[in-house]
A protein has these predicted regions:
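Short glycine/proline- and acidic residue-enriched helix-loop micro-motifs
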Residues: 112-142
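Phosphate-coordination/substrate-recognition cap region in phosphate-metabolizing enzymes
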Residues: 4-6, 47-120
């Protein structure tokens, strides 16, 4: 059955914008799990803000990671809101996928390696349906439990309200899988700044919109 808006929390769940830098943007550091938005990602965040500028949200939440906070920023400024940071909706902690160049000189090679790493992550998770195939990662079931707990806790505070949550592709997959009753923890590639809408009332959850990217078609 469908949950009425006045009886449920309506979660607009948004994946962060693109965070794979081009050669002229990258700053070699040796640590690449909390990258800022790329030039494309910043454009996507602005497009999202333009699309949702007339919407009303009762609260705004974000993963603490930089790419999510930067995706939220343009909309937060338009709506005069401040995101609440929620550690439970951070992306899964992954082990090493592939070695990255250690030197700081060849930024072209580093940029290419980061792009290939992202492709590998989606390929491995998509093929297996979970994250345990990547050694030394956060266990897939524990990750899903963490995400569901955090999302449901957000929902419990906002029955009859609409909130927006900025998070990650793995997080969206885990929560959508729980809503749909799927065993897989990863089953689709969530697009950058895509919108997924779920209504939640306790343990009752209904998926209304999934992976909506109408505002960023120029980047497809």
């Amino acid at each position: 059955f469908l949950l009425r808006r006045d009886q449920a929390a309506e979660l607009f769940i948004v994946r962060h914008g693109d965070a794979i830098p081009e050669e002229d943007e990258i700053i070699p550091s040796g640590i690449y799990d909390d990258l800022p938005l790329s030039r494309i990602g910043r454009e996507q965040a602005q497009a999202l803000a333009e699309r949702l500028s007339d919407a009303r949200f009762d609260a705004m939440y974000s993963s603490p990671l930089l790419r999510c906070q930067q995706t939220a920023a343009p909309l937060a400024e338009r709506l005069h809101m401040t995101p609440t940071l929620v550690p439970g909706i951070q992306e899964i902690r992954l082990g090493q996928i592939r070695p990255l160049p250690q030197g700081h000189e060849d930024v072209a090679a580093l940029t290419q390696a980061l792009k290939e790493r992202q492709v590998d992550i989606v390929r491995i998770a998509g093929t297996n349906g979970h994250w345990d195939a990547i050694e030394n990662s956060e266990p897939s079931k524990e990750f899903r439990r963490r995400v569901v707990t955090a999302m449901d806790e957000i929902a419990s505070k906002h029955i009859g309200q609409r909130v927006i949550v900025f998070c990650h592709g793995g997080v969206i997959n885990a929560y959508a899988a729980e809503v749909l009753g799927l065993e897989k923890d990863f089953f689709f590639p969530a697009a950058n700044t895509s919108i997924t809408v779920v209504r939640v009332a306790g343990k009752q959850r209904v998926l209304y919109v999934m992976n909506d990217i109408a505002h960023v078609r120029k980047h497809i």
